[in-house]
A protein has these predicted regions:
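C-terminal closing repeat unit and adjoining cap/tail of repeat-based domains
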Residues: 165-182
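Internal metal/ion-chelating core segments
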Residues: 1-52
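Alpha-helix capping and helix-loop boundary segments enriched in small/acidic/polar residues
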Residues: 13-14, 59-60, 193
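Short, solvent-exposed loop/turn segments at secondary-structure boundaries
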Residues: 153-156, 191-195
Length: 209
């Protein structure tokens, strides 16, 4: 059973979830080069425990989360393929790769610390792969994720968003041998708008036996 990834405080507590996340999608494909478009949806039922406060009894409370995603790729012959994905939702931050482990599916409400709210979040990427020859191809991808703080009690260093850029080139020397090089750039921004960037160059060699 999947568990939500919230930020708890002294007035809230985790409980076992009873309803799984519910996904659904529809997809359309066309052409001879694998072009497709997919619309996906997700519903989440996230339950937590409210501790007793003055005039209130302890009880379980549930927040609903949801997500919508549009994704796909467009093949232009055997040379160029474009791919894309866009996601928006409420209480789904852990479904983003950069948001996983940030404890932002829910966090305490400013006006009532024994209540959790679900922040809005959006993200997506665009990319392209270019087949230079039968053995050499290059690709580039740019992605961005953003968590929208609303009615939430959060720390200044909580995750707010990130950007990512990757550019690479690969060469298939033989059917069982491949070499590649990649440049990566990334940026993280916190809720107080403090940010930092990082750069990396990496290489890879793959041999199949």
């Amino acid at each position: 059973m999947p568990n939500p990834n919230p930020t708890y405080n002294n007035y809230t507590h985790a409980v076992n979830q009873r309803i799984p996340d519910i996904p659904a999608y529809i997809q359309f494909m066309w052409g001879d080069y694998g072009s497709r478009i997919r619309l996906s949806g997700l519903l989440r039922n996230m339950t937590y425990r409210q501790y007793a406060l003055e005039g209130m009894d302890a009880k379980n409370k549930t927040q609903m989360g949801y997500g919508l995603q549009l994704s796909g790729n467009i093949g232009l012959g055997n040379i160029v393929t474009f791919y894309y994905q866009g996601t928006y939702g409420n209480g789904i931050t852990s479904y983003f790769q950069d948001g996983s482990g940030q404890n932002l599916d829910m966090f305490p409400k400013q006006e009532a610390l024994n209540e959790l709210v679900t922040p809005e979040a959006w993200g997506g990427y665009v990319g392209m792969q270019f087949n230079i020859t039968e053995r050499v191809f290059a690709s580039a991808t740019y992605s961005q994720v953003r968590v929208l703080s609303k009615d939430g009690f959060y720390q200044p260093d909580y995750y707010k968003g990130s950007q990512y850029l990757a550019v690479n080139m690969f060469c298939r020397v033989k059917s069982n041998m491949m070499f590649g090089i990649e440049y990566l750039w990334g940026k993280r921004q916190n809720m107080d708008n403090a940010s930092n960037t990082a750069n990396r160059i990496q290489t890879v060699a793959r041999f199949n036996f």
